[in-house]
Amino acid sequence: MQKQDQPVAFFDSGLRGISVLRETVRLLPQENYLYYGDSLHAPYGVKSEAQIQALSLAAAEHLVSAGAKAIVVACNTATSAAIGLLRQVYPDIPVIGTEPALKPAVEKYPGGRILVMATPMTIKQEKFQALKHQFDDRAQIIGLPCEGLMEFVERGELRGSAVEAYLTEKLAPYLREPVDGIVLGCTHYPFLTGAIRRIVGPGPEIMDGSHGVAMQLERKLAQSGMLRQCGEPGTAVFENSLDEPEILALSRALFRYRDE
């Protein structure tokens, strides 16, 4: 297999990174993709930094052995804890991380109120705090830890009374004092954009960083001459550490999901 035809590999603690994969496929449909969900060890967001680093290294090793030409860490928590380590271990492979779309939100709403929904671990991580500090003088940035929200996505529960009750409770203070933008700081959360919109109404813009990740991947592949030059769409293969038919079926369903 030629280098250009080798897959771009994604990994996440479960299924949430499929939201990043979907955006990447829209930008680079000709590429081949391999998605690895580590649902056996989910969620990463409540684990220690050392645990997340060990799990991330194991996932990356699996993907490299499968022939990955680039790795996308499709998880904000793993990016915060392990991206530097992964780049040290694999200096010859582009390793792309994800981070909340805080910069574009602040640029669009200078002096505004920006709510960042993320896992408790992401909110606590030094990487996020440094990013927040970078823009503190340009906008009011509010971190909202959402423990348990990702599990709704992992169950495929993207709408309905339970998830909307959870979101209503979390977002109630920001309905009384509205925000200008809501940054989805976890790659699970784009699947819940419709549910969030139904609660907050048409006012705040909902933003995530998936498109920025896809564009960065395109730049890295172009720089290294590894863009696949083919007029036909590529393939998308799904793997999961649980190796259960149900979770692989859910992975494919999320890949095709459209919310209104």
State where each predicted segment sits.
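Non-catalytic structural scaffold of enzyme domains
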Residues: 1-260
